[in-house]
């Protein structure tokens, strides 16, 4: 999904439509308005976590999106500490250290509320589209929509349909 001069909104819509039409996404449906929970997210999470740049990190900030749940689960199972934004307290995070914390519904029971993501070494944000230069296009609003700007490396997960050589519009974050 690419072309000439395209707005970010038009590119998001094109990606969402292709994912829906080709049935390459899972709950929540429809994918429009979300960072899609794409088929293959678990494999993408495994690949990212095993990448040499990521393997050295022990503490991550990870978005709350459903597409990132496999990454949260795998990271917690391998002993990483995660900070996930608190859904009801803006600016707060859940500090998570056990696999039960991968699910948003379990975070209040197993997580520790924290104001700052202490010791975080990298960020993983969900996306609607990404490019090979590191550009990321989120859903256009909400937590992490424009990146976090914490001076930490930021990563994302994407289905090949969501990935292009270069975004046809300005990236939300890089």
Predicted regions and their residues:
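Surface-exposed, charge/polar-rich loops and edge strands
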Residues: 1-35, 46-57, 78, 90-174
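Extended, H/D-rich, highly charged conserved domains that either
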Residues: 60-76, 80-86
């Amino acid at each position: 999904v690419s072309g000439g001069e395209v707005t970010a909104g038009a590119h998001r819509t094109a990606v969402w439509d292709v994912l829906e039409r080709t049935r390459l996404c899972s709950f929540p449906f429809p994918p429009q308005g979300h960072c899609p929970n794409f088929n293959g997210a678990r494999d993408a999470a495994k690949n990212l976590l095993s990448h040499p740049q990521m393997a050295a990190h022990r503490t991550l900030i990870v978005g709350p999106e459903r597409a990132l749940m496999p990454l949260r689960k795998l990271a917690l199972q391998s002993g990483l500490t995660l900070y996930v934004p608190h859904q009801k307290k803006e600016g707060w995070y859940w500090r998570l250290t056990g696999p039960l914390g991968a699910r948003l519904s379990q975070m209040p029971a197993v997580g520790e509320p924290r104001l700052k993501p202490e010791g975080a070494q990298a960020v993983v944000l969900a996306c609607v589209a990404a490019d090979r230069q590191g550009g990321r296009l989120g859903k256009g609003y909400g937590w992490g929509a424009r990146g976090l700007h914490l001076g930490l490396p930021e990563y994302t997960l994407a289905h090949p349909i969501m990935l292009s050589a270069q975004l046809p519009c300005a990236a939300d974050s890089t």
